[in-house]
């Protein structure tokens, strides 16, 4: 997405062909463009995605047309789809863990992780489950279904789009200049988040890892920088995906709603990666009984869902612990009413501290590194509070931190909204979007390519 070839060659060519193609052929154009887009970076793993599309398409039809074998068709789609995800993403993790516990020496498979497999697998699963539940009819057109699963704006890193949310638009979507303009604005805002904010925070994170400089302040700068980096990186991709979807006539679900304004961890997860949280709620948590079970069964449901949420993000123990950490925090908020009675400022501060520290665990390459990072944050091992080099980096990145903090709130959005409908507002918006495109292009031409963090999931 955030590359010169995509912005100035692939995207204009696809949009030109798409809008010149008659309505009946538009989904075929999208499917072909999406397969080219995926094959551009993962050609040898493209057949895996095509197979998953074909599998869930056939299973969806089987579920709808069969009276006695609906569950068999559903289980087939779930077992094979989850099996493929498990083999490619988790096989080495489980083999390595088994070897460590038992002393065995089972060789690792070293399989390449297909880009976006967690996202398109969850989309396919939600489709077959919804067809089984009778929530949606099966899609009869393989081209339409393939376009839904492989749709290039959100294929790689979400949001996780459910078939039910865009079923009508797959066949009867509307296009307009207003939709296209709104979509392009959203796309450019997302591009700016990624290129100007996320990538520059990534530079500071790289400096922290490579400089060898250790002080308590530098560890905290790193922790806050990564929390802002992952937010702008992931929400930037979501903005770009939602914006491009709007240009093409689709209305994807929102994926972020200023999560760092949350007053509780529960609220944070209603605002962060919304499509993933709702997916686990509707397809795992509620089918397990949700909160309508005994207290200890409910606790087990919470622990299971959040362990799976952690594993969804990556095949490593730090992700498992990251998920269980949030499970513990959510349970604490339910069991300790005093947390909700704290003054708003204290509740907000506790959530920010918990989230920032959780992302230190999330970003660690190993549990050993996580332990080292936490020790540094709290000054263990005789670390100095600060140093001349740390203060230099703080001054150098102070403006970026201010922009990042402001950008994680609706301050800019609210200011722009107050100027909606005015001539000055229209001129300023157009100038701002043009300037944003120019600045982002300059960054992309001058710098090295920095992939989105969630591509690896």
Locate predicted features.
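Membrane-embedded transmembrane alpha-helical bundles that form the catalytic cores
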Residues: 1-456
